[in-house]
UniProtKB/Swiss-Prot annotation:
Bias kind Basic and acidic residues: ranges: 1-28, 41-53
Domain of life: Viruses
Organism whose genome encodes this protein: Hepatitis B virus genotype D subtype ayw (isolate France/Tiollais/1979)
Segments of this protein annotated with the region Disordered: 1-73
Protein name listed in UniProt: Putative uncharacterized 10.4 kDa protein
Amino acid sequence: MRRAEVKRSAHGPADEKAQTGSPRKERCAPWSVGTADGEGDERVPSDPEKGRPQDSAPTGRKQRTSRAGSSWQHSLAAMETMYICGIGQQSYQSR
């Protein structure tokens, strides 16, 4: 029991919540929200403040850039979700 506690504290409070059981699902929610937030970055490349107006970039090209950005964030969030929601937990509890 103590060994598990030590590992839990090493990972921080996020893991503590994941350990308890039902709040585990609540812990997953903010990450899925975060991916939706990341998709909002599509507006950044076409921002006039950056000196790249919408007209200069064709629609297809702009979509591809934003999609690459969101998919990267999506995969990162998915990995963190998997770890926090207990898939990563199984690996170190079985040791």
